[in-house]
Amino acid sequence: MDAAFLLVLGLLAQSLCLSLGVPGWRRPTTLYPWRRAPALSRVRRAWVIPPISVSENHKRLPYPLVQIKSDKQQLGSVIYSIQGPGVDEEPRGVFSIDKFTGKVFLNAMLDREKTDRFRLRAFALDLGGSTLEDPTDLEIVVVDQNDNRPAFLQEAFTGRVLEGAVPGTYVTRAEATDADDPETDNAALRFSILQQGSPELFSIDELTGEIRTVQVGLDREVVAVYNLTLQVADMSGDGLTATASAIITLDDINDNAPEFTRDEFFMEAIEAVSGVDVGRLEVEDRDLPGSPNWVARFTILEGDPDGQFTIRTDPKTNEGVLSIVKALDYESCEHYELKVSVQNEAPLQAAALRAERGQAKVRVHVQDTNEPPVFQENPLRTSLAEGAPPGTLVATFSARDPDTEQLQRLSYSKDYDPEDWLQVDAATGRIQTQHVLSPASPFLKGGWYRAIVLAQDDASQPRTATGTLSIEILEVNDHAPVLAPPPPGSLCSEPHQGPGLLLGATDEDLPPHGAPFHFQLSPRLPELGRNWSLSQVNVSHARLRPRHQVPEGLHRLSLLLRDSGQPPQQREQPLNVTVCRCGKDGVCLPGAAALLAGGTGLSLGALVIVLASALLLLVLVLLVALRARFWKQSRGKGLLHGPQDDLRDNVLNYDEQGGGEEDQDAYDISQLRHPTALSLPLGPPPLRRDAPQGRLHPQPPRVLPTSPLDIADFINDGLEAADSDPSVPPYDTALIYDYEGDGSVAGTLSSILSSQGDEDQDYDYLRDWGPRFARLADMYGHPCGLEYGARWDHQAREGLSPGALLPRHRGRTA
């Protein structure tokens, strides 16, 4: 306990010397943190060493702080060391220790605002580096000095307060800080106002910095903004200082009433116009421009019973603009004297002074002008019966001139009359029809016809008035009802079979001259009422039934139809009814009335038209069939025609699928029976692009014999040609048709188109190819002349049979 007490006294003495700043104080306090107590017991580890205080900004360096010693130093040498912030941790090099003496030195100036304390650990080691004592803690506290000025948080503080505010009204608050130790007077701040002008209207709380009003007299119209100079000082007002400003703005209140600049205003207005400005009313207001306390509102107190004037406020100038909302009439009133007042948009403060010119008079003089005519009744509505004849009076659409002091005449004309139906008297405005208006006019909307009439005066600058004339076209019952289509159908012969026949009626007239319709059997024929009955279904339909069984067939009835107009119109109309035999379901039995029903809906003219149409259709079908037949026959006359005209040798045209019979006659027998049908073609032979060319003069085809007497010569020529054919095999030799022959002798096909005309063609060389090409040679070669024809006639006279024309060798066709 004695050692601890001595340690505490030493630390207190050190702190006192440091705080008093005793010059030359260098001897540090010696600490024995490991000294044993008198009872030879060690000091506990948990025993806390009081902090070591050192002032910041100490300039005498190095400065000894403290000396530590170990009790074991008497037994041998001890090495001391320290660790922690300021030694081997940032900031490094602030503290050091003499390892032999244990003295701790301050090597750098301290700044409490950066680091207010350091916690170090002290070690005692022997020369071998072994620990002699347990580590102990050293805490070094940096003592604050008043080395920081206070600082305001803002360079300029702003505040607002209403003008005329009572004393003690809060305005704003100034705030400041000090980096020194807040637990010392170095950071004890005091606020004050250095300057605010005269009189002193504001005060500041020295501790809190709140600014408040201290007396009345704040008037925005006198001073709108106050600029105060504030000061803050530490050491409770005796230390370092700093300054700032406070800008206080006074908010406006409506403490000034608006006033007119004059007691009377004089203006002029033109009659018969509206929506125009007449003049301006000037006012003054000292309150803040643009605020509700400044904006003026005008009221017309007297002189405008009809509400013809209004006053609006110009937002830029705050002047009142007098306007006309209803047209003025010079003839009714030449002068207007208005009494006008002005107030602000915001209510006036109770303590504010009343305005001396809060009201003014406005005198308005009306100028006379040429006004347009005025129709006495506009729009004018009238009615006219449907189908009114031309010249019918419709109405008199008259107008008056409001300019009583100007003697002017009015003239009338049409501006809109789409059907050109009306005629207007230019002097009186009398309107009458000039033709009959069609009920189907597209300009008749809902039974109303609309026209526009103009009235114009004769002034130098004439004015025009527009009037609307609406004419209701009254419906007239001028049409009788008729039976509605479609025509009636069949009716059962039994009175209680089937639904009966539903009859309907229509009427071209509009309501109320149309339905309901009345259906009645003609009273001229009493027998109709005994055989038939009519029952009303609704306003437009009735049902017809037989009273008892009536004969089947066509019955001609007569109905009397009447509408509901005034006066009613009626029409007697015939009705054809077909009566048939019906089954239990009330439907006509098949074929019961088929024949008779055809006459119910067709007249004689319709039947004639139907028959004529059928006959015309039949004639057209016959003409088409004949034309097709002639066309087919004409096609059969061609060069390569059908099997009947095929005269090629053993080349048969079957014109059927699968081929025909193998053995058939290769010649056309009909041509042999009628040799006169074969004649020379008219004109030169056609140019054949698909035939061989090369000879200069083609031979004309041979002429067939015109008489049966020449048949023998013709046959002999055929036999001679067959015998002289080198390609014909011997008799009774099998023919091979699948042999395609040798290659072509010609080396090129360029000779096909080498000629320029038909005269350059020569087809006689085809005869050299054998009898199979004789037909082509006859068609395109030179004619054989009279000698060939004579042989034909000779053969015919010899009476040779057609079979002689057949070749001697016939083979099978592939």
UniProtKB/Swiss-Prot annotation:
KW Transit peptide (keyword) present: no
Consequence the record notes for mutating M109T: No effect on cell-cell adhesion
Propeptide: 22-60
Annotated glycosylation sites: N227, N531, N538, N576
Domain of life per record: Eukaryota
Chain residue ranges for the region called Disordered: 636-663, 676-703
Extracellular side: 61-606
Ranges in the topological domain labelled Cytoplasmic: 627-814
Membrane topology label: Single-pass type I membrane protein
Subcellular location: Cell membrane
Signal sequence interval, chain numbering: 1-21
Protein's UniProt keywords contain Oxidoreductase: no
Effect ascribed to mutating R92W: In MRD3; affects cell-cell adhesion but not surface expression of the protein
Tissue expression remark: Expressed in the brain and cerebellum.
Pfam families: CADH_Y-type_LIR, Cadherin
Disease note: A chromosomal aberration involving CDH15 and KIRREL3 is found in a patient with severe intellectual disability and dysmorphic facial features. Translocation t(11;16)(q24.2;q24).
Domain comment, as recorded: Three calcium ions are usually bound at the interface of each cadherin domain and rigidify the connections, imparting a strong curvature to the full-length ectodomain.
Protein name, UniProt field: Cadherin-15
Lineage summary: Eukaryota, Metazoa, Chordata, Craniata, Vertebrata
